């Protein structure tokens, strides 16, 4: 399950326990001007600078939809799985002194065939599920022209239904969220030691 809420300690790293799995929190903060900010706190890799995400949406910001798809489909080779593993992906190190080193390091590590396949799977599922969600929620009257080429298993599978349920949950929270408040999603998705909730950005428990 993807947990909504929770945050690492002030050091930016989670306390390690015996048998503890590395985790990552990605916080989506609603900002004025139809923008949203993403902040990553993770166990592995350099600390990352926050960045504004693409594709603002009143219910499902683009990168939040991707996170939920990759988490439910267990796509560890997708964008967020790679970030949790220590890569920067679409982010960059908060310490500018590490930027060149990180770029060199990642340029030497080419994605595997499995990672390429999972990234493509993430794009396909996110595109299809966002359209399905908008149709079901009444935010779209008809599908786009490419939709009739989508394989039927992508439209009617149990995985698709589970993703749509996650999108429903997030969309309701995000739409009701005041500007300046945030929702935090935890990776890996089966980590249950986070409490649900939304709170003002920067707030500490």
Across the structure, where does each feature detected by a protein language model lie?
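Auxiliary, metal-adjacent structural segments of Zn-dependent hydrolase domains
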Residues: 17-35, 42
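Short amphipathic beta-strand/extended segments with alternating polar/hydrophobic composition
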Residues: 46-55
